[in-house]
UniProtKB/Swiss-Prot annotation:
Molecular function GO terms recorded: potassium channel regulator activity; toxin activity
Tissue specificity remark: Expressed by the venom gland.
Protein's job: Blocks voltage-gated potassium channels. Its application (10 uM) to cells recombinantly expressing channels results in membrane damage and cell lysis.
Protein known as: Potassium channel toxin TcoKIK
Family: Belongs to the long chain scorpion toxin family. Class 2 subfamily.
UniProt source species: Tityus costatus (Brazilian scorpion)
Keywords assigned: Disulfide bond, Ion channel impairing toxin, Membrane, Neurotoxin, Potassium channel impairing toxin, Secreted, Target cell membrane, Target membrane, Toxin
Disulphide-bridged cysteine pairs: C17-C37, C24-C42, C28-C44
Amino acid sequence: KIKSGWERLTSESEYACPAIDKFCEDHCAAKKAVGKCDDFKCNCIKL
């Protein structure tokens, strides 16, 4: 049960911005993009 909550949190990584940039980076890395926090949203920038 904890795992599903954690996956939900990491999949909604913008909620971690700007507190935890790593969530945003990891979330975007899975999409082969670079994650940057923009206020409270996580933006994935394609390379």
